[in-house]
Amino acid sequence: LFGPIAGLVIGLIGHALVDFTAYGPWWSWIIASGVFGLLTGLFLGKLDLESGEFGKKQIILFNVSQLIAHVICWGLVAPVLDIVIYNEPLEKLFAQGLTAGIVNAITTGVVGTVLLVAYAKTRTKKGSLNRE
C-alpha cells in the first residue's frame, strides 16, 4: 500500500521496538524484518489494490511473493548477519531461520491474504462508476 521505503522503515522500527521493550535488540533480525518490508513493498506494487481487484491471481501472486521474501530474509539475511555480527554457530542459525520463515510465511499467508481481500473490497472497482 505504501511502497518499499515505508515497508523497510516499518519493518525496522516495528521489530526494533519489540526487541527493545522485550529482551534487547537483535540487529540481524531487525535488519531482516526491514528487508522483508522492503521486498513486500516492491512485490505489492505489482498488485494494484487501488483498482479494487484482489482475486485468485492476485492472492497467488501475493503468497508466492511473500514466500520468496521470507526465504530471502529468514533463510539468508538473518543467518548471514548472525554470523557476521554475533559470530553465532552455523548449525543453529539456519534451523532458527527456517523455523521463523515457515511460521512467518504461514502467518503472512493467512492474515495478509484476509487483510488484502478486505482492503480491496473498500476500493472502488475500475469501471464501476458511470458519468451521467
List where the protein language model places each region:
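Loop-helix junctions at membrane interfaces
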Residues: 1-132
